[in-house]
């Protein structure tokens, strides 16, 4: 990631500006997934925030959102205090009567979708080298072509620090290629067969997620 003095030609890459937050947060969530740090509870927490924000936009007040989280608590182990904190997060800086939520949390999933599709695209184009540009500093995905040009001209320094999954791209490339392949294959017969045959099968060894 960007460190002070690391980009001698482009110090602006160390500063946040419009469009960078979504990609930075999306890249962070993608990193959790690709490195195996993401779990179902965390994923559900992110998706619940998006649902709660939309509920407030549609008119839900503080109490409505609190009840929404309480209803979800049985499955995701969210207690009263956490439900209140989750609700407070949605309403911070706004009004408790609804219609004016704090929408920043929506960028997590939207950013994830954009980053994921960017990764798939560069793998399909056999241009995985472009992934490392994302670690040169804070940027929007729309900036990547321009920064690639600058890098070719020696005006963009390579990133000093890379996470393991970006340093060795073999797993990422394999994963994205496989996920792209799965999207092309439609096997509804197999899916319905397994869903019917496995529905109601007892949980083994007390394992659950």
For each of these PLM feature ranges, what is it?
Residues 42-201, 206:
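Conserved alpha-helical "signature site"
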Residues 6-54, 111:
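Post-HExxH zinc-binding segment in Zn-dependent metallohydrolases
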């Amino acid at each position: 990631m960007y460190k002070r003095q690391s980009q001698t030609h482009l110090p602006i890459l160390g500063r946040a500006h419009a469009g960078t937050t979504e990609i930075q947060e999306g890249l962070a969530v993608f990193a959790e997934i690709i490195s195996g740090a993401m779990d179902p509870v965390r994923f559900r927490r992110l998706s619940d925030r998006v649902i709660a924000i939309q509920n407030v936009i549609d008119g839900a007040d503080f109490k409505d959102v609190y009840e929404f989280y309480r209803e979800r608590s049985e499955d995701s182990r969210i207690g009263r205090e956490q439900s209140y904190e989750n609700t407070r997060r949605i309403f911070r800086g706004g009004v408790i009567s609804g219609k004016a939520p704090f929408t920043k949390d929506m960028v997590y999933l939207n950013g994830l979708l954009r980053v994921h599709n960017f990764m798939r695209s560069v793998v399909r184009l056999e241009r995985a080298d472009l992934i490392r540009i994302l670690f040169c500093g804070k940027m929007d995905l729309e900036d990547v072509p321009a920064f690639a040009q600058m890098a070719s001209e020696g005006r963009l320094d390579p990133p000093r620090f890379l996470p393991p999954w970006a340093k060795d791209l073999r797993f990422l490339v394999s994963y994205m290629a496989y996920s792209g392949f799965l999207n092309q294959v439609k096997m509804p017969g197999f899916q319905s067969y397994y869903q019917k045959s496995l529905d109601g099968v007892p949980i083994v060894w007390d394992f659950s997620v």
